């Protein structure tokens, strides 16, 4: 008997054809409609965006060492002079880091990469509902990210990733290219949301009711609702910004009777729900990992499922907490603050149910499980720091400080990136017919320690500026 036949007899999968080797050549990948291949291409693309934005983050940090000692764009004398950036260069690196990390990495990372790969298989479907639309969304992601990159070489971008007016109207940098890139990325996000929503609604296997779906699919469903309803608001806002720069239509520019605060309302009406586009899919991944590696049925399945939908719906009602210092009426601020605290309830439901699932479970400390536990730890810190920003009395002091930077990074990077890595370590061996690395938990602990060393000092730095005003004086 031939060697291949022996392997087939013993293992049953030797030399079998899979989605990676079924066809060869770059064209087979460029024009593929296979959801798994599209997910792999998304994973490669967002990884590139992660490393590029991460490089900008490291580079802008050197500004704290060599404050304003080098001429922008030139090499000064000395081996380390290249890393010395001016204040202007700092603004550009800060903006590019935020824009690429948010629009090109965090938003599409878990839903578009992991979601594309596992969603049809979890449903028992052959593919997503609209395979061609799925491929189109990936190419829109490439074009949108390309426009952001083009802004890098065409005057760069120094407005901050939020594109706040009126400065974004007046800046001589590549604002139009960057906003158009974000506009295209919005279409990519909408197409993904439509595809997933229709797929989950219409292509579930026979007998798979709503409350038999994996919790990861519930999180993708809630995320898709946000993508479809909120992203068009951002797209229209960015188009208005471009028209304001080109035609001076007087929407956001106060010189022509516009209102810059209106831009903030439009932007955050999308961007706060977008926070849940970033974190909800990661929560779904963690729900799967906790149940599998605790070797228990998930505790409170229905509560976790409905909490995803509740977070998605409440996320549309809290955008104003980003604008407590913008001149809103005190009554509006109180309302937004109260609703913001309400959002913490379904988030806490998820965390406590994860802990209850782990309680008395036969926990297997594999790499994915370690990432899931790290997620709970980091997301817990991010959630606790968020309470200070939801309260009016403390947000006034913490606004625009490193405290906000720490909160955002604990939730987005400590949450989304950790969940993405946990999901990749969990599902990738199944696709490659390989085993998990035994040194994975050690590597995770190294990453966790480095992340803490990098981000936690920002909490202290954000508090120090107003420490005197926060002290309790004993009478």
Protein language model features and the residues they cover:
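Membrane-embedded and interfacial regions of multi-pass energy-transducing membrane proteins
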Residues: 2-475
